[in-house]
Every structure is written in C-alpha cells, then in structure tokens.
C-alpha cells in the first residue's frame, strides 16, 4: 500500500505543479502566450490540501478525524501549513468560505455551502488519501465516509458523487483490476 500512497500523491503533486501555471487559461490563450517557464518546487492548494488529508490520516493511526482535517485545512489557510513557500494561495471560493465558517465557530457539519453555485473541484482534489484509508474498511459505508470528507468544504451532492466515483476508480486501480465495469463501482 505504501507504494500506492507514494505514487498517488507524487502523481497528484507533479500534475498540480505542471498544470498550475496554465490554470484558468484557455487553449486559445495558451497558443498565443504559452507557458515557457515554471518555478521549481511550486504546487497549489490541490497538493497542499491532499497533504493535509494524508497527514491527518497518518498522524491519527489511519483513523478519520473530521475535526482534525478541518483544523489542518484552516492551518493551511492561515499559516501556509504544507505549502512550498509558507503561504496559501489559489484557494477556491467555496473552500475559503467553509474554512472561514469553521474558524468563526460554525459547527463542522454546517461549514460548507450546499447550493449548486458552490460545486467546484475543491473536495475532489484532496480526496485521494481517503481511498487509501478506505482500502482497510468494509465496503458498506464508503459513500457516507466520502460524503462526510467532501462535505467539510463541498457539501453539494454533485461534489460528493464526483469524489465517490474518483475513489471508486482509484480503488479499482489499487486492487489491480485491469478492467472494471462501472456497474461494479
């Protein structure tokens, strides 16, 4: 499992680092103004929040602690925890709203916005370590766990379903399934 964790998180971080300079730009704009240089060692919130999730699981003996997750996300926002330069940047509006709610004492289960205007990829980008946790858990209850982790910042059902499907595919890869059918997910 250690190889899957390392490979998964490194793959995510490399993809994040390579994609970050082009984030928010159209293909058309990149034709005229391509990314020609990249700063070394820079990653975005995608990697930082994934590392927060992984650190929480590892430091809690692979147990999920939703309060600890939100504390680490808030520490990232406020203090640049697990960032390459000690400063959080590139934070999505929905994630920021949920974390500010948490910092202002809103109960954990009420921090994230639930409307369709808050459907971003903020929970999807950090959910992979949860699949590593789920590998040692019974299949029943997978969706509820994934939903709970997603809903810390992104509570709309579209976000939680996206996370569930992503984890299902990652789980199939971890289980060495060469071909899998959507029906088995």
Report each predicted region and the residues it spans.
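Structured, active/binding-site neighborhoods that engage oxygen-rich ligands
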Residues: 1-185
